[in-house]
């Protein structure tokens, strides 16, 4: 339990309904979202629900040295990284975003990853502010005009 009446579950994408209204903005913003979603049905997602309705989602991916970053406009050397593939939080539950970034950080530590990154468009001002408050810095652009933000993991 994260907050009153909010339940966090881990589910594979194949157990989610892509037609749920929660996904509409992702489908509208990323024209290939449905294709991407259907190609990753075994990937796990962290989901919060309130009254059986999705209120947030976090999808992570551990990348390795075989990853291709040719669409980045600045060198991004292949390395073991944690990518935040999808992070969407219903506006009424913004605090969950902070919890998800903590979860991503802990996942990076658990998997011996030195860097986390996320790509997003500049219209996501609240998310950019949240990232910057949590030690993410702007790194570069992608060819599709998304911005790349990174967080270097400090190990003690």
Regions inferred by a protein language model and the residue ranges of each:
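Short amphipathic alpha-helix that is part of the acyltransferase structural core
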Residues: 1-40, 45-47
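Short hydrophobic/aromatic beta-strand element in the GNAT-like acyltransferase core
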Residues: 43-48, 57, 86
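Conserved acyl-donor/pantetheine-binding loop and adjacent beta-alpha core of acyl/acetyltransferases
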Residues: 53-83
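A short, internal acetyl-CoA/4′-phosphopantetheine-binding micro-motif in the GNAT/acyltransferase core
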Residues: 85-95, 121
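Conserved acetyl-CoA-binding loop-helix of GNAT-fold acetyltransferases
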Residues: 94-108, 133
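Conserved GNAT acetyl-CoA-binding A-motif
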Residues: 108-122
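Conserved catalytic-core motifs of GNAT/GCN5-like acyltransferases
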Residues: 119-120, 135-150
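Conserved active-site tyrosine of GNAT-family acetyltransferases
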Residues: 127-136
